[in-house]
Amino acid sequence: MRVFVAIEISKTQILENIKKFQENAKIDAKPTRTDQIHFTLQFLGEIDEILCEKIKNALNEISFSEFEISLNGVGGFPNLKNPRVIWIGIEKNGAEKLISLAKKVEMKLISLGFEQDKKFKPHLTVFRVKKRIGDVSSIMKDFETTNFGAEIVSKIKLKKSVLSPKGPEYSDLLEVNAK
């Protein structure tokens, strides 16, 4: 099974604001379904049931306090001149807390053979670009200071991802609440 550790966005107002942004941005890219918007703390890839149980045990040992994040601004990976992903960002304090939580996840899973292959950059993927769409920086300029709302981070999830022609389908394998 293909799995990852995530934080979901659950606040209706934020999801509605993201949906409005996706509709108003008018770019030729595939929007992320709002029921699938999340922060990927760590992608773990294909694993078996035995390793999944070990991962669950490790994640259950993580202790963290809930915290608030404010979602604002937009950007692209690798950049807005030739993006593959369009994302929504997080204000500095919340980003630092997300980075700290991602580090806790990584430290718990490193003994199971999982290590971040690249530095965690807190973002919400809101569009995936399949074909070259060129420079969208002028379109995104209108949204660079948009505030999408604030969310309380109170749980992390181990999620299963099943790929299909219609896109990925996610299901929860484990939920770890803030303590």
Give residue ranges: language-model regions.
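Histidine-dependent nucleotide/RNA phosphoesterase domain, centered on the 2H-phosphoesterase fold
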Residues: 1-179
